[in-house]
Amino acid sequence: MNLDVTAYYDGFHGDLNETYLVGRVAESSRDLVQKTYESLMSAIEYCAPNKMYREVGNIISNIVEPAGYSVVRSYTGHGIGRIFH
């Protein structure tokens, strides 16, 4: 289950989500969620002033691709902030 929460405050939208495994979940699905989470946490850990933005994608790819998953390279995000998606 994916829970997506949006808040609007003082002219700005904020957005977050979390994935929960519910019931009997296939091992392949469990692995996908785990690798996704692991790559996200590794990418966040890397982020700091003066770090190269492009390296974030490399960090994610280096975790998910050896596990047989791929990264969507043309995704550009969505409108959030003053404009809601």
Over which residues does each language-model region extend?
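Active-site neighborhoods and metal-handling regions in enzymes and metal-associated proteins
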Residues: 1-85
